[in-house]
Amino acid sequence: MKIRKMLLADYDNVYSLWLNTSGMGLNDIDDSEAGIKKYLLRNPDTCFVAEKNSTIIGVVLSGHDGRRGLVYHLAVKASEREQGIGNALLENAIEALKGEGISKVYIMIFKNNAAGNAFWEKRGFVIPDESIYRAKEIALIKHIDT
């Protein structure tokens, strides 16, 4: 297994992996090829894919606003899970964010995503007592359930 920086050329394979991963929370704007291109241009050194025999089996998007890091869409192909691939992708993302001077990382997970919540909790991500996450859509977004 090899981990490398994600390229826009990986989009079709990565998107297919996301579609086949439960609880991803995709949408037609941010997760379109144009949306991912914009994200990769802004965060060229913090997004990674895992490959096995030249096939993408895992992915993580991460980036920052200069103060805090965010991790999005960590996914590993179902048949490749429980082998440390998710951990390795997360470690690469966190090290890349540290390298850019980021000291705190956030992740957003759906409440009903039990497997996802267990994964993040096991890795030290906590639900902060002092804050509430709020969101407002400022464009018409079509959500894609996985």
Regions of interest found by a model, annotated:
Residues V49, T55-G63, L70-A75:
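Conserved beta-strand in the GNAT
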Residues L97-I109:
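Conserved GNAT acetyl-CoA-binding A-motif
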Residues K37-V49, L70:
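A short helix-loop-beta-strand connector motif used in the catalytic cores of GNAT acetyltransferases and
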Residues K2-V14:
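A short beta-loop-alpha structural element at the N-terminal edge
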Residues E82-E95, K122:
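Conserved acetyl-CoA-binding loop-helix of GNAT-fold acetyltransferases
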Residues L74-R81, I109-F110:
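A short, internal acetyl-CoA/4′-phosphopantetheine-binding micro-motif in the GNAT/acyltransferase core
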Residues G63-Y72, R81, I127-S131:
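A conserved beta-turn-beta hairpin within the catalytic core of GNAT-like acetyltransferases
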Residues I107-G116, A135:
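Conserved beta-strand-loop-alpha-helix junction that forms the acyl-donor binding cleft
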